[in-house]
């Protein structure tokens, strides 16, 4: 029991760090009146959007809460509410810091690059540590409540279902935040670029463009609030799925041993919060003035400290010796943890290779832009497809090594360790929107060239960190979903062995010569494509509306271009808020309803009865794998491809192939316009979609068993 309270203490420390860092960020200078005015507009827009988004989610949430309470009892419904509320809180607080840090970063950059870096990173670290801390506290405190105050057995079904529902609550927020935020940010970006850069020939973040404020609002709601919700969900879901597997695999152990093994994923999360906090103090500009180097110092320090920490935790909780009822040792689990950290490092490195301006892929797209728009798009698509190969091979190796060391539980521990670094990784990601906004504010407020140089350098790195963290989010989501699939499979076996009334006579057959399995695989495989298509279409529609609006303002107020009239920024923000909220509902329900639809459709087609149930459970299981396989590739190709397109444009803007305004630059802007919704809307939203499908299947089992 003491172990659980120590974990709570670790979670509480992350909140203490966040409070300390927030006060230090808010104490910084906010710059001149013009800068504060711009930042105020961005802040207002972001808050208005989030308020509306959360109200929409709340309506859906109340319905689901009532359904869960009816089918699975109030404890499970409360778990769902905890997951949703905490996930929403992490994104909301993080974004509120981010929209206050942007102007302070721009001001700090007027004195030194190091000052700007320190402020922007600190703002990011607040979001990062809140994500890890609140996710850990939510799962741990509810687990403590269930086993100590509600008096339930650690592996009882109510505990398992309540924790799965907590993951589902986080998932629901994350798919809405990712999709809605993505539609908003890219509608503004693409629409603003098409009229501003291409038609009117004005630079990015020019105050004359009516869509600029909306674009800066979008960075915060998409990359800060959206990413926070996404990784909060993966963190919570993986911890829960690992606990579910522990409850099943170690069912024969003594209650104390069982509790120790079930606490293990939480303890790994706890120690890694401490290592992430320590890691933030390593982020300092060195003699080389490399910003990416400074950030990587923090990441590497966190990784090395985590390696030691995870070893200590496993040794203290379960020892390195043999474990009860299974064939592997505690040492093997530690080795799986090492593999998890290695996979994290490799995926980050590979993503940087595909999206950084120093490497072949981005340079090849820039080179292709010289010959025109078509060749830019062709090369970009080629890179987006190529970028899936190496991450997939790394994930394959990770699965094979950990499975040979400690079976399915080994894969789960590796994934847990990978996710335990989420605090540091989200910090790198949330650094992005702060620097992006700082650059926008510096441009709009007309700050001197040398300040723009500093903010541009920070922003370029921010773009890379955003891409890199997306790679990590997808890899961990794929592995997390695999752990959830294992939980589905083991849960199914458990209910059949327990002879639950509904499961009598059920014998699922996952062999590939079962046509229902093939049908399930194909159905699961189509979901990420359909979902991605809905996301891309939504951005296209939103961008179209913005193009019309910006053209209207230029037409009706000719003084805008001369600088005598002020554009109406609020109109674009309002238009996008409505569009994003409307467009996010239907795609978000796709992964929630699919498993239920497949189950009952196949059950009816296969003739009902025990045979129908067997066919339906096999089809749903296969569907989950189908979603994981294609989802992983769709998400990686979209995020890496989109990131490469974006940075190819930046590479040309840095003075290669004719620089800004050249024909190559115009072609690169086209590529970037395609890459934007790829990397910031459809790609990242596939993550939560993969996990929701798996979680709904787990809850479906629980509901049928009741």
From Swiss-Prot:
Where along the chain is Mg(2+) 1 bound? 189, 193
Q: Where does substrate bind?
A: 186, 679
Q: What is this protein called?
A: K(+)-insensitive pyrophosphate-energized proton pump
Family the UniProt entry places it in: Belongs to the H(+)-translocating pyrophosphatase (TC 3.A.10) family. K(+)-insensitive subfamily.
In alphabetical order, the GO MF annotations are: diphosphate hydrolysis-driven proton transmembrane transporter activity; inorganic diphosphate phosphatase activity; magnesium ion binding
Xref: Pfam families: H_PPase
Q: Which species is this UniProt entry from?
A: Rhodopseudomonas palustris (strain ATCC BAA-98 / CGA009)
Q: Which reaction does it catalyse?
A: diphosphate + H2O + H(+)(in) = 2 phosphate + 2 H(+)(out)
């Amino acid at each position: 029991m003491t172990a659980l309270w120590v974990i709570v203490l670790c979670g509480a420390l992350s909140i203490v760090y966040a409070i300390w860092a927030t006060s230090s960020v808010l104490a910084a200078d906010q710059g001149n009146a013009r800068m504060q005015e711009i930042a105020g507009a961005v802040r207002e827009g972001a808050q208005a959007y989030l308020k509306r988004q959360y109200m929409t989610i709340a309506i859906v949430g109340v319905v689901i809460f009532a359904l869960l309470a009816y089918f699975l009892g109030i404890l499970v419904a409360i778990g769902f509410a905890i997951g949703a509320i905490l996930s929403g809180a992490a994104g909301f607080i993080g974004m509120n810091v981010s929209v206050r840090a942007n102007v302070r970063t721009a001001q700090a950059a007027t004195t030194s690059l190091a000052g700007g870096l320190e402020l922007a990173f600190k703002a990011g670290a607040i979001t990062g540590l809140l994500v890890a801390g609140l996710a850990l506290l939510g799962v741990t405190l509810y687990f403590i409540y269930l086993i100590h105050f509600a008096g339930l057995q650690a592996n009882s079904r109510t505990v398992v279902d309540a924790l799965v529902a907590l993951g589902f609550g986080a998932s629901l927020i994350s798919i809405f935040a990712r999709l809605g935020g993505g539609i908003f940010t890219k509608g503004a970006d693409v629409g603003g670029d098409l009229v501003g850069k291409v038609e009117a020939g004005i630079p990015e973040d020019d105050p004359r463009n009516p869509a600029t404020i909306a674009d800066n609002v979008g960075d915060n709601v998409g990359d800060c609030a959206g990413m926070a919700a996404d990784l909060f969900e993966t963190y919570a879901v993986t911890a829960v799925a690992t606990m579910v597997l522990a409850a099943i695999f170690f069912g024969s152990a003594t209650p104390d041993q069982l509790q120790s093994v079930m606490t293990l994923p939480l303890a790994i999360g706890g120690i890694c919060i401490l290592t992430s906090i320590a890691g933030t103090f390593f982020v300092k500009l060195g003699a080389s003035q490399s910003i990416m180097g400074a950030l990587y110092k923090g990441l590497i320090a966190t990784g090395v400290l985590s390696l030691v920490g995870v070893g200590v935790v496993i040794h203290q909780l379960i020892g390195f010796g043999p474990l009860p009822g299974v064939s592997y040792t505690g040492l093997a689990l530690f080795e799986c943890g090492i593999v998890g950290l290695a996979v994290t490092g490799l995926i980050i490195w590979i993503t940087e290779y595909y999206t950084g301006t120093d490497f072949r892929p981005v340079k090849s797209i820039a080179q292709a832009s010289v010959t025109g728009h078509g060749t830019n798009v062709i090369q970009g698509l080629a890179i987006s497809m190529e970028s899936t190969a190496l991450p997939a091979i790394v994930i394959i190796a990770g699965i094979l090594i950990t499975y040979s060391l400690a079976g399915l539980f080994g894969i789960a521990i590796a994934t847990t360790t990978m996710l335990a670094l989420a605090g540091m990784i989200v910090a790198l990601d949330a650094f992005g929107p702060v620097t992006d906004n700082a650059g926008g504010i510096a441009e709009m407020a007309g700050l001197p060239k040398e300040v723009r140089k500093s903010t541009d350098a920070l922003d370029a790195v921010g773009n890379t960190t955003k891409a890199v963290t997306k790679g990590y989010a997808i890899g961990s989501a794929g592995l997390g979903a695999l752990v959830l699939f294992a939980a589905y499979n083991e849960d199914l076996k458990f209910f059949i062995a327990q002879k639950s009334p509904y499961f009598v006579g059920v014998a699922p057959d996952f062999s590939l010569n079962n046509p229902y399995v093939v049908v399930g695989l194909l159905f699961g495989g189509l979901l990420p494509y359909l979902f991605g298509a809905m996301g891309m279409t939504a951005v296209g529609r939103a961008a179209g509306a913005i193009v019309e609006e910006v053209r209207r303002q230029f037409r009706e107020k000719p003084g805008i271009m001369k600088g005598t009239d002020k554009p109406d920024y609020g109109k674009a923000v309002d238009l996008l808020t409505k569009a994003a909220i409307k467009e996010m509902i239907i795609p978000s329900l796709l992964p929630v309803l699919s498993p239920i639809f497949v189950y009952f459709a196949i059950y009816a087609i296969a003739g009902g009865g025990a045979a129908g149930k067997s066919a339906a459970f096999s089809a749903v299981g296969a569907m989950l794998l189908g979603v994981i396989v294609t989802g992983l590739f769709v998400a990686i190709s979209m995020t890496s491809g989109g990131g490469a397109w974006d940075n190819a444009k930046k590479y040309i803007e840095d003075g290669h192939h004719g620089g800004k305004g050249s024909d190559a630059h115009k072609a690169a802007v086209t590529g970037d316009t395609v890459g934007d919704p790829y990397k910031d809307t459809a790609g990242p939203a596939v993550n939560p979609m993969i996990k929701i499908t798996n979680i709904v299947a787990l809850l479906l089992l629980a509901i049928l068993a009741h």
